[in-house]
Amino acid sequence: KYDERTESVHEVNETDYEQCNTVGKEHVLFNDGNTKVMLTKSGFRHFISGNQSHCQMGLKLMVVVMSNNTKKKLIHSPSPSSPSPSPSPSPSPSPSPSPSLSSPSPSPLPNNQGVTRSSGAEFIGVMMWLGVMMLLL
């Protein structure tokens, strides 16, 4: 929570984030004192304090939201063939094969081009960020 009379949160573009520009036509302004942001799509999100001096002291946050779309991009390897039936026991004892110490290697992870974000997660970090800022005041 933060004091909405003295503070606000701005969602900004990367340039305004880097320059702590608190005035911009494209800014999304939050000033309810208890900001929660839904992360509904992947990509970069930039948040700064609406108080420029606070932003310049480091009160800003960049979030990278990763997508959970690995099911679509998994590389399907052929299913393993059925194990061959074990031979019938022979009358003479034979040494049993030693167990394999190596396990099958896992399928490779998909090669994601670019950075993505988790969808549907509630963004509470802004609240914590502003709480820290209030402690600094």
From Swiss-Prot:
Glycans are attached at residues 13, 51, 68. Pfam families: Cu_bind_like. Induction: During nodulation in legume roots after Rhizobium infection, and after release of bacteria from the infection thread. It is found in: Symbiosome, Peribacteroid membrane. GO terms for cellular component: peribacteroid membrane; plasma membrane. Residues 80-98 have a biased composition (Pro residues). The keyword Membrane applies. Residues 70-115 are annotated as: Disordered. One of its GO terms (biological process) is nodulation. Keywords: Disulfide bond, Glycoprotein, Membrane, Nitrogen fixation, Nodulation, Signal. SUPFAM superfamilies: Cupredoxins. The keyword Disulfide bond applies. Belongs to the early nodulin-like (ENODL) family. This is Early nodulin-55-1.
